[in-house]
Each structure stands twice: as C-alpha cells, then as structure tokens.
Amino acid sequence: MRFLIGALLTLQTLVQASSMSSMPNYYPVPEAPAEGGFRSVVYFVNWAIYGRGHNPQDLKADQFTHILYAFANIRPSGEVYLSDTWADTDKHYPGDKWDEPGNNVYGCIKQMYLLKKNNRNLKTLLSIGGWTYSPNFKTPASTEEGRKKFADTSLKLMKDLGFDGIDIDWEYPEDEKQANDFVLLLKACREALDAYSAKHPNGKKFLLTIASPAGPQNYNKLKLAEMDKYLDFWNLMAYDFSGSWDKVSGHMSNVFPSTTKPESTPFSSDKAVKDYIKAGVPANKIVLGMPLYGRAFASTDGIGTSFNGVGGGSWENGVWDYKDMPQQGAQVTELEDIAASYSYDKNKRYLISYDTVKIAGKKAEYITKNGMGGGMWWESSSDKTGNESLVGTVVNGLGGTGKLEQRENELSYPESVYDNLKNGMPS
C-alpha cells in the first residue's frame, strides 16, 4: 500500500502521464502522500439492478475509495466467471448505442468504468465468492492446478473489465487444510497480479483483498499472519452477530460486549479487531465492516430475550434495509457504551437490530481511535441520503472526504477484449 518516493515517484508519474496522454477525457486527482487516509469501501451487488432498482450511477462516488463488485462465481476447475452477464456486461443504459462498431462492454461494468473515469480516486475490485458461491472454493483451492486457474482467470477478468484488483469472499475455510489452501490461493493471486503489474505500462499495483470473518469460530481457523503477506487490506465482516439462527434476540453489529445483557452480544467487533492485531495483522489494514440493514426478531419481549420467527423484510424475511428504518410505531434505543442500537415495537413485540446515525458516529470514533484502515459497508442499495446516510456519517466522522486515502485508479487496460474499454470509453 505504499508509493515509491523521490526519483522513483517522479519517474512513475512521468510514465503515467506519457501513457495517459493518448487516452481521452481523463480527470486526474493530485498525488497524495504515501501514508495516511482512510479507506471507504462498499459492496455493490449485481442483483441490485433488478427489484431494488439500484444501479452504479446511483453511487455517491466521492464518498468511496473502493467499490467491491459482487459476485463472480468459481467452477470446479478453478475458473472464475461472471454470475450474471446481462447485468454485468450486456444491459444497455441510456446513452449506450446498439450499433456501436467493435466488441464492446456495457452493463454495470461500463458504468463502473465511467465512475472511475470521472472520480480518479475511486477504485473497483471484482469480488469473487460470497455466501452462496463459497462452497465452490474448496475443490479448486486444494490443488496447484486449480489455484493457478483461479488466479489466471480472475486476472483476465480484471484486465478485460477494467478493475483495480480482486476481492475474495470465502465463507469459510472449515479446517487446517482449507486454511492452508486459502493461503496458497492468495499467494497465487498475488503473484499473478504482481506479474501483470510489472509489465503494465503504468506499473500500478493491483489490489488483493478479502472479506474476513468476525466470529472467532471462523477466524481462529485461518492463518492470519501468513495471509496478511499477500493482502492489501482486510474487509472485516463485523455484522450478522445475531439473527434467526439464535435462541434469543441480539445485537447484530455491536462494537463491544454488553455487561448488563451478555446474552444479547454473543460476538463483538472489538474482540475480532484485537485478535487480528494479536495475530499479526496491522490495524491500518483492517477495514471495519458495517451493515446498511437490520435483522429482526418477532414475538420477543426485548433485546436478549426469546423470540419466535423474524417477520417480513425489505427483500427477504427478517432483513430490513436501513432506509426502511425505523418502522412506524417503534421506539429506538441507542446504547453508546457498546455502540449498538435497535428499534422495538412493544405492541407488535417486534425488534430490529440495526445501526443508527449516532451509532455510526461511534463506530467512526472507534476506527479513528484504534488506527484502523477505514470502513466498509454491505451493501450500497440500502443507505439513506443526506444527514441520515450512515456512509456519510462515518466518512464525516473520519474527517470528511479530504481524509480518505488518495490513490489514483487505473484506466489503461491495453489487453482488454472490449474495444470501448481498451480505448478509454471515448464519448
């Protein structure tokens, strides 16, 4: 995550300027210091364009340093492939031409590139896996051939589609062998990315990140220090601590454990962060994941008590978008000591654990106080706007957009199979 300095930085800047001079309509940002700056990371899911009506153009790009485009899938051979080509590469948005000559990319991928072009501090990464596709990691990760196929094909997608790196979301390695295989998979990816960077005209470093667990039953199986050698940063999934699978209602994204109702906080972000650091992961590489949704508990007498069912939801039962919160008739409780909040409707006996603006501010304080790498959110379609935005609240709490990490994205993809992307998406 470091830039070269002195003469090497000057040389790199000259090379970049020379390479980009032949490519039209770029909007460069000033060079930033090598150290300092928070990451602001968000997952954009390709299925959001359907019922949610959420498209890349809806992202408030100046508030983010990284967008993780989710999800690509994995074949048993290790081949990484797009999960929805209509959403990813085919859908025509307003302004896209049907009779444009050449082999061109459209869909969310084109829109992501245009976001990068107009926001030079915004990087995009292809996220591979996720909860649904995670069972597909085990087989290819177990062999050298499978790992090479994974690394080579994910790199090809990155080069073809104009990403700045790849993000791996394996939930979760189950034993010692799979943990070792994960390290070797990251090593293969890091080597492939660095080899491409070495021959790339601009010499930019391409990024490798993962979505990492916040539950000790999962991260204690991982080889954290060995993995860290290959990663640029970790997206700590500090949410889903409680839900439909539990016996009592609980907080789903608390920073600290509760001393008054310990049964309501089976996990905590703080324990995970401390354990990662103790294992050898630098604090400034840990990006704190936060939810833009809430988890519900029905027929309950309050936090930390039994429940029966989870009720409805915005898109799935028991899960409510933050923008749908709080529900009418519910009273909001904010517990600053554990950095958690929830709403409760005593008439309906319905409780939803979610982050409020005040709690988002407390999490920004926690990130700053502990020298962490920034914040991450799942997922972009669910936030509110204006002063009620959780993303905006955290970014402001970190010092505003001027305190975000400043690292210019990559726009040159000379090996892309898509003519319009290879040519810089000319107007």
Curated annotation (Swiss-Prot):
pH dependence of function: Optimum pH is 6.0. Active from pH 4 to 8.
Marked site: Transition state stabilizer: 169
InterPro entries listed in its UniProt record: Chitinase_II/V-like_cat, Chitinase_insertion_sf, Glyco_hydro18_cat, Glyco_hydro_18_chit_AS, Glycoside_hydrolase_SF, Glycosyl_Hydrlase_18
The protein's Enzyme Commission number: 3.2.1.14
Annotated phenotype, changing residue 171 to Q: Loss of function
Keywords: Carbohydrate metabolism, Chitin degradation, Chitin-binding, Glycoprotein, Glycosidase, Hydrolase, Polysaccharide degradation, Signal
Name recorded for this polypeptide: Endochitinase 1
Mutagenesis / variant outcome for changing residue 109 to T: In strain: IFM 45811, IFM 45817, IFM 4945 and IFM 50994
GO terms assigned for molecular function: chitin binding; endochitinase activity
Superkingdom of this protein's organism: Eukaryota
Enzymatic class: hydrolase
GO cellular component terms attached to this protein's record: extracellular region
Organism of derivation: Coccidioides posadasii (strain RMSCC 757 / Silveira)
Effect of residue 13 to I: In strain: IFM 50993
Catalysed conversion reaction: Random endo-hydrolysis of N-acetyl-beta-D-glucosaminide (1->4)-beta-linkages in chitin and chitodextrins
SMART domains, per the entry: Glyco_18
UniProt domain GH18: residue ranges: 38-401
